[in-house]
Amino acid sequence: MAKVTLKGLSHSYLKTQSSDADWAIRGVDIDWNDGGAYALLGPSGCGKTTLLNIISGLITPTKGDILFDDKVISGLNPVQRNIAQIFQFPVIYDTMTVYDNLAFPLRNRKIPEEEIKVKVHEIAEMLELSSTLNNRASSLTADGKQKISLGRGLVRSDVNAIMFDEPLTVIDPHLKWILRSKLKELHQKINRTMIYVTHDQTEALTFADQVVVMHEGQIVQTGTPVDLFEKPKHTFVGYFIGSPGMNVLPCQIKGSDVIVNGKKIETHQKIKKSNFDKTEVGVRPEFISFSNEGIPVKVLSVSNTGRHKIVDTESETGKIKIIAKFNEDIPSGSAFLKFKKEYTYTYGDSWIFE
């Protein structure tokens, strides 16, 4: 196991770079403590897999360093880095038994067979593969095959980190939840550094203690799931996390006042000055309520999810979604909205006012 540190990492697949768009990732700085559960979250093409492949040694970064336990390992090859990597699609040996698949990494390292037997049975029990150990791997279902891939990463006790690149892509939605829960349980048992790459917010937020959100090759926020939900530091984090995502509305800054649709609203921050090209207010649907005064809107539709109602409204400057209690009476036609001050934030050029 190891503490993983990334310092000033940037990478481009082009020989020359003339703009930010030429970089797959840029200016990445991360500290992941030994034994933690982490997630890299972002849409396709944001640089997640590039970053993962740099850590494992499959790609050499254009700039920056990778450190394990404060030692620079940028020049080491993938084998020397001692990383276990689990990919989107199960990588198994079909003609081997499940037992032999799990034992394979240990046999490559000349581990004594008795020790291999103990370790394989331990991991098989954790992953509920014990009853299939003598079966050929080709006979297993998609989730069973991915369990083998997970097991081969977990069976080694000498790895510096275990990295998962969208490991549940091919898994049925119900089985995803089961495997994700099992992975979380395994992390608590073996206490190894795990880095989970995904575009799925549910996977990231339920697995990781700390989530790194990436957007267009940059890290826009790192924090706990609660941090990311309650205080998005970038409007992208607000859009991307939450269902529905954060409402983001254009606003004007007049002195220390924040104006939305001609109405002054109170926000979490005290505004001192604004020299941004674009200013916006962000508030999640959970923190908006109907009121006798406030932002004027027109109620467009109401969807009952069973747990709550999602109300679509429209204001002068854009649509606003509200999450209301399932038994709450929703006005029809014209209405007014009030934003909860503690969770209403002002953004300048997409970044939160600090």
Listing of model-derived features with the role each one plays in the protein:
Residues Y38-A39, Q85:
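Short beta-strand immediately N-terminal to the Walker A/P-loop
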Residues L41-P43:
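The feature captures the beta-strand-to-loop junction immediately N-terminal to the Walker
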Residues T49-L52, I148-L150:
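ABC ATPase nucleotide-binding domain helices that frame the ATP-binding cleft
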Residues S56:
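Helix-to-loop junction immediately C-terminal to a conserved catalytic motif
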Residues G64-V72:
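Conserved ABC transporter NBD signature motif
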Residues N82, Q88, I92-K233:
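ABC ATPase nucleotide-binding domains
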Residues D257-E354:
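Non-catalytic connector elements of ABC transporters
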